[in-house]
Amino acid sequence: MTKTVRSETDTFGPIDVPAAALWGAQTQRSLAHFRISSEKMPPELILALARVKRACAEANRGLGKLDDAKAAAIAGAADEVLAGRHDGEFPLSVWQTGSGTQSNMNMNEVLANRASELLGGRRGPGRLVHPNDDVNLGQSSNDIFPTAMHVAAATQVKERLLPSLDLLRHALESKAEAFADVVKIGRTHLQDATPLTLGQEISGWAAQLALSEQAVRAALPMLCQLAVGGTAVGTGLNTDPSFGAAVAARLAEQSGLPFESAGNKFAALAGHEPLVFAHGALKTLAAALMKIANDIRWLASGPRSGLGELSLPENEPGSSIMPGKVNPTQCEAMTMLCCQVLGNDAALAIGAASGNFELNVFKPLIAHNFLQSARLLADGMDSLREHCVDGMEANRARIAELMARSLMLVTALNPHIGYDKAAAIAKHAHRHGTTLREAALALGHLSAEQFDAWVRPEDMV
């Protein structure tokens, strides 16, 4: 009869583990003790941990600390994790020890058991590779987990967030160019203002994204400073003095990111300023995206009783009771996820500010929030671009209608008749329901020819 469990042992003694699982005793204890909510350790962080463990094995081999066979087996097991072959082996909750120790040990146990099998051994008692002595050699959760946090964050920013941001910015720049000839009324304080082109308005959105991109890129160098080599409290106890630099060099070579060993390991363990700063850049991007999405849905409001200056793609029915209704759903999704990012920033900052002495113990929260924000923003920008911006069109007739009705075109008269007379024309037109031209002639402040020559919206942009 096939056994469904096997016995694994740690310093607390034996514990039953599912026979098919690659994890060991400490992972099993964490599963038992932290049955909290449904948030699991982010997959991006798991992959980063695997990359870090592979680099550590290679560095230890290079330093003569780990024999070739074990190092190759650990690296091979890590490669399997990176290939997605063991996704189910990392079941731990985000809400665990604040150092991430249990997830570090989860990775150590999985790699040790799988490396043992790759060497022809078994998993569990009698394994050929030890999770602490071999996989975790020269390391502590206190330096390895924050190292993985930085690797995951920098990787997601480079590979997911920035490409999505770039594509959305280019899509908006394309629309700005396409609508460069569409003169429309501007709005400030939600009231009519002087004209601009729709292209100019959209160019502002694109420029907001460009500024946000600058902020995100400025944060990358700090994320590339790694804690590895600091071990328990930053002194580097029980590791080779060159270990941190060796690991960082391997990670840099494999990723194309300029990873390097942090100059001060005490700060790297006890504080998380790089992630606070980087998430601040994500918050900046979220603020810009929320403004852009709100502008788009307001300009598309209607279709008959709103502004109606933009037409958006009709992707799905909008109401379960009102037939034919179509809503700006992509904008709504974007604004919701931006709210989540702003909330993530507050929680992340509180966590980063709450370290004590030589260690911050809010690391899983910080990692979870950062990676969720990066994921939300990247996916949200892709969705907004594909299902909204690319198909967005200008309602030229409606724009012209609203332009003709606006009282703020009177601003063009200021240099010719002065502010007070121009204001009197606007108030007269509003009070009597007439056009500006009719009001100007009624008050006798200028001739019809002068009005037609001076009030030209296309000359006001």
UniProtKB/Swiss-Prot annotation:
Pathway: Carbohydrate metabolism; tricarboxylic acid cycle; (S)-malate from fumarate: step 1/1. GO terms for biological process: fumarate metabolic process; malate metabolic process; tricarboxylic acid cycle. The record marks E332 as: Important for catalytic activity. The keyword tRNA-binding does not apply. Substrate binds at residues 99-101, 127, 130-133, 140-142, 188, 320, 325-327. One of its GO terms (molecular function) is fumarate hydratase activity. Keywords: Cytoplasm, Lyase, Tricarboxylic acid cycle. The active site is at H189 (proton donor/acceptor), S319. One of its GO terms (cellular component) is cytoplasm. It catalyses: (S)-malate = fumarate + H2O. InterPro entries: Fum_hydII (IPR005677), Fumarase/histidase_N (IPR024083), Fumarase_C_C (IPR018951), Fumarate_lyase_CS (IPR020557), Fumarate_lyase_fam (IPR000362), Fumarate_lyase_N (IPR022761), L-Aspartase-like (IPR008948). There are 2 substrate-binding sites: the catalytic A site, and the non-catalytic B site that may play a role in the transfer of substrate or product between the active site and the solvent. Alternatively, the B site may bind allosteric effectors. PANTHER family: ASPARTATEAMMONIA/ARGININOSUCCINATE/ADENYLOSUCCINATE LYASE (PTHR11444), FUMARATE HYDRATASE, MITOCHONDRIAL (PTHR11444:SF1). Involved in the TCA cycle. Catalyzes the stereospecific interconversion of fumarate to L-malate. This is Fumarate hydratase class II. It comes from Chromobacterium violaceum (strain ATCC 12472 / DSM 30191 / JCM 1249 / CCUG 213 / NBRC 12614 / NCIMB 9131 / NCTC 9757 / MK). The gene is fumC.
